[in-house]
Amino acid sequence: MSPISILLIGFAMSTDAFAAAIGKGAAMRKPVFRDALRAGIIFGVIEAITPIIGWLLGRAALQYVEAFDHWIAFGLLGALGIHMIYNGLRPDSAEEDEDPSQHHGFWKLALTGFATSIDAMAVGIGLAFMDVHIGVMAVVIGLCTLTMVTVGIMLGRVLGSMVGKRAEIIGGVILVIIGATILYEHLHGVA
């Protein structure tokens, strides 16, 4: 997998967390960089671990599905991408009126981080069928997420109403394109 594809997957995996961070930043009275960085680290670590878990699950099943692994990667990335696009296009439900101080709790951040990283676990399953170093991919996904969450919280006040959903749509489109590229390359023998 090319370095550009690895970076694009890292970016795509961080868009859910970025959208959540914008929402958290928008709910805070005045986000402080230290709190934003702390949230970024929590999200980044979780987002880096989940594709490794998915990769391990995928490797365990590899011998049984090698003949159609490209279809699995395409299906997982495509389905996740379409789901992200759908979530980005659907109208928001009623906004919760939460106490902004609750956005800083470790367990609340960790739970949100895990919820936004489920797609990274599924991508990890797909990566098990490809020639990619999972350690490098996990670090890239974690660093992209750390950066996107930190920036998202700090910009949340300003960007909350403008960017939140678009980030998820862009991430979804990227996943669909990468999935289609994997399928195309396999079917046409492109290395």
From Swiss-Prot:
Disulfide cysteine pairs (residue numbers): none
Cellular localisation: Cell inner membrane
Entry-linked Pfam families: Mntp (PF02659)
Keyword Flavoprotein: no
An annotated Gene Ontology molecular function: manganese ion transmembrane transporter activity
Transmembrane segments: 3-23, 37-57, 65-85, 107-129, 144-164, 169-189
GO cellular component, one term: plasma membrane
Nucleotide-binding listed as a keyword: no
Topology versus the membrane: Multi-pass membrane protein
Assigned keywords, A-Z: Cell inner membrane, Cell membrane, Ion transport, Manganese, Membrane, Transmembrane, Transmembrane helix, Transport
Record's function text: Probably functions as a manganese efflux pump.
UniProt record similarity statement: Belongs to the MntP (TC 9.B.29) family.
Protein name, UniProt field: Putative manganese efflux pump MntP
Organism expressing this protein natively: Stenotrophomonas maltophilia (strain R551-3)
